[in-house]
Every structure is written in C-alpha cells, then in structure tokens.
Amino acid sequence: MANISRLTITTSEFVIRSSREPYRIVNEPRGPRYRGLLREGARVSDRFLFVDIPEPFYREHDTSFGPAAKRLVEELAPHLISLTSDRSWPGTRLGEVHGVKSYARIYRYRLDAESLEMLERATDHLFSWQPPLPLDLCLLRPDGEAWLTTIASEDTAYLRLAPEEVAPLMDRTGMDLQRYLRH
C-alpha cells in the first residue's frame, strides 16, 4: 500500500494524498512520445478530464469549443462520467474578471482502450489541448489524484509520481522529467 501522508476530502470525491511528487515534463511529448505518455497513463489512470471555459459569458449554451472539440465530445459521449461547473481543476484555479467569478465546464470520462484511442487520434502533441481542442487534458488515478496535469496555454505539464516510478517511466517513454520545485 502507498505511504499515505494525509487524507483530503472534497465535496465531489475522495482524494488520497500520497508520497507522490510533481515532475515537470521537460520537452513537449510529440508523436510516439505523446502516444507513449498516454499509454503509460492508461496503465495507472482510470479517468481523464478536459475543460471548456465559455468566455466571455457563462450561459447555458455558451462554449469555447470549435468544431474539432465538439466532434471529440460527441465521440467520447459513451465514456462521459460527469459534466460539472467549477472554478478549479488540476493545475488551474480561475479568478475573477471585472468582479465576476469565472467558471469552467469540466468533462470527466472513463479511460479505457476505446477512449484512449480517441485521445491519441485527437492530436499528436500534448500542448495542443487548447482551442480548437478542449483545454488541459488531465489523467486521473483511481484515488482521484492527477497523474498527468496539463496547462497547455502555458506549455506546461507535470506528472505526480512516486520516486520508484520516475526512472522506469523515463526509460519506457524516452521523456525527460525534472522534479518540480515550488517556490
């Protein structure tokens, strides 16, 4: 069993915090490395999410999704677990714009062989998870913790890994990872 340091309970799900640490993905995974990253993620993750921030307003049918994002959402519909409105998701917390709180639609899906194939077909590189595609692909472990966090608009992504997971993952994917130090 993982070394559990604390238990955090949120209103939407239980999240177990472990000894996992964030590791920044040094170079954007593209092509085979992108597909390898997703396949490695599917080994330890059972869900994924991405986001729609309907700007500038948040009315029922407003969306930032263009045709490619809408097609992907339609294709993934059988895998949809939930669609919620929230101000935060892994790696991001929305602020206020002109005194108005911003909200995003968070799409959560089951990650299985079929949905994995759809993610692989949607694009061939990690930081393309922004318009015209949905924002910020994240892969979630069964305990609710993000395995992969993407902040595509900032060309940033990191993985939460236990120390013993780092070297084997780098060997299998060919990716460079760097321990993410917070200031």
Question: What are these model-predicted stretches?
Answer:
Residues 1-183:
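Structured alpha/beta or helical-core interaction and ligand-binding surfaces enriched in interleaved
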